[in-house]
Amino acid sequence: MFVQTFILVSINHMSNTKDIAIVNGARTPMGRYCGKLRDFTAMELGAVAAKEAMQRSGVEPAEIDHCIIGNAQQTSGDSIYGARHVALKAGVPMATPALTVNRLCGSGMQSVVTAAQMIQLGESTIALAGGME
């Protein structure tokens, strides 16, 4: 089990084109089956990684305007809307939209692609994206 998150931002606010950058990221250590991380849910680990990614990038939780988290193995009771749980546990305001993506092995990558598309379309300026299993 591990979790990784990234902060994506639009770096051309005043132009018609939007260049997008991953400004920072964080991940948890890789865990073994029934290892030391067994008592933590993916959502708890996701929140730890999300908080660290925001801290490293200097982004406040209130600045996040979309949270997109990929999760293929929704095995715990709180994983049905995992992105919302991660966002709230990381301090992102309740009014911020959250989207959980399931694209099996590519869920985390799809969350980054979706966040970039939202920024490109002007639906977001700063997004929190990542994957958790």
Regions found by a protein language model. Name each.
Residues 11-49, 107, 111-133:
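Conserved beta-strand-centric core segments of catalytic alpha/beta enzyme folds
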Residues 43-58, 82-86, 111:
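Short, well-ordered amphipathic alpha-helical segments that serve as non-catalytic structural scaffolds
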Residues 67:
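Metallo-beta-lactamase
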Residues 71-127:
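Conserved catalytic cysteine-centered active-site region
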Residues 1-12:
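Short, positively charged and aromatic/hydrophobic N-terminal segments
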